[in-house]
Amino acid sequence: MELEFKKCNDFWIDNGVENLYKIFRKIEKYHPDIESKIKPDKVILQFEDINKFVDKMAEIVEELKYERLLIEEKDKKTGVKKRVKKDYILIQYGSKDSKGVNTLKEKIYTNPKDELNKIFNLITTKPKSSKSNKVCLCCGEEFSKEYQNMKQASYPMTTKIKSLGGIRGNAENYKEICPKCYLAGILEWADDYLYKYLGDKSYIFIPYNFNLVKLNEFKDKYRIFLNNSNRYCNIGENREIYGKYSALLKFYEYLIDNAKLNENPNIVWHIITVPNKDIKNIKVDKFEMMGEIFRVMKVTIGELDGDSLYGDFLNGIYIKEERKNKIEWEGTNELREGISEAFLTNNFRKFVKYFIPKNKHYIILHNDARKILEKIIINWRWIKLGIPKEHLETIKKSGNVIAEVCIHNNLNLLYKLDKVRTSEEFWSVMREISRKMISLDAENTKYINPMVLGDLISLVKEYEKDWKELRDLLEIYSCMYISIKQYKPEDNNNDNK
């Protein structure tokens, strides 16, 4: 018998189809007469003995349930181990078993053999006359009888009622899902995606490519890396992930550094936000890694000589409260997430703004973080400008001058520089900086070169069409030198790694 599971241009169901292929391949190892193939638009399954096939698939589903959906944890009050589902799993608990252990309500996970028999019986039943057939909401194909109506357990994008039991509303025509799509959707929870729990919400990262073969090849590159035994995060240490963009930054660094990914895989990530509340109305965002940012990451990582873009750059940045002289951890984590987002979305202007000290807080950049920041600046912006590299020293030294002026006056000049909208406003702020610099005493100017501002003026006039880019570079170097000048030896003892 031959069955086809076709893609339907839906990220959840199509990933489920690719996941079925992975399951079928496992079955092949035990039964050579069972064969599966993956094509760009479908997965083909061939078998002779359906009972033998279902028996083995049921065993695999049972294993996946404990590997991917459920986890054992000690009860905080009693200290007794109990079985709980991971927080983002949108499947209800069922009745506890005879030992008082939690189970899942979906029968395919509680009694996989019987339920798989029912599902494959429906799949292999030929449709009757078209008048009595139903149309699947996901794939659009006709089928005779559903295994279950669509609900959030099999398709998370449905709008939920409080009981988590179905779709809100009474639209009878918008709840039918064929047995094939149900099977793909319900087993997608046992697939190789990324997840991260953040207390009030969880993120699920689902990769997508319209070509199932390419999707399968991409997922094969990272499956072994995922720590699926962790309840809260399967991408490294849970406490070192601050949000969805820092998670992706860490993940792509792994792909480049460990999985030796040389080219941007052209994957669209569907990021599902699951609220930690009774009504699970989810939100789906998309992210696609741009080729330019992938190149910057690859080049920068290749230059690090043992350092880590994530561990030594991102985790080497802190916000410190000036008055209390201590790390402000909530703000630090928000800053790291914001920097990750600005970088991955190719927004250098936004990236620069995150380094501006504000509200009686200053930013600490550890030595390694500063070195890596400079590499990012060069690979991301300076090379793109096409300006000879020797002119970069003019920008850096001018940033040092601005930092010295700001430290001994106030940060208003830096804020003014950040807000300029025209080249005329830019020149006005630079004249004000020059006037303030003259008032500095000899002790304060011995580590800067005031004459460099003349070179800066010549540089900006020569490349005036790029004055905004040069302003951004000047600004981020000013922030970097302000961080150096505000640095205290005890800051180096604050480490969250």
Feature names for model-found ranges:
Residues Q486-P489:
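Eukaryotic acidic, Ser/Thr-rich intrinsically disordered low-complexity regions
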Residues L3-K6, F11-I13, P32, S36-F47, ...:
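Hydrophobic transmembrane signal anchors and adjacent membrane-proximal interface regions, especially
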Residues F5, F11, F24, F47, ...:
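Phenylalanine-focused residue identity feature
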Residues M1-K134, K145, E425-R431, R435-T445, ...:
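N-terminal alpha-helical interaction blocks
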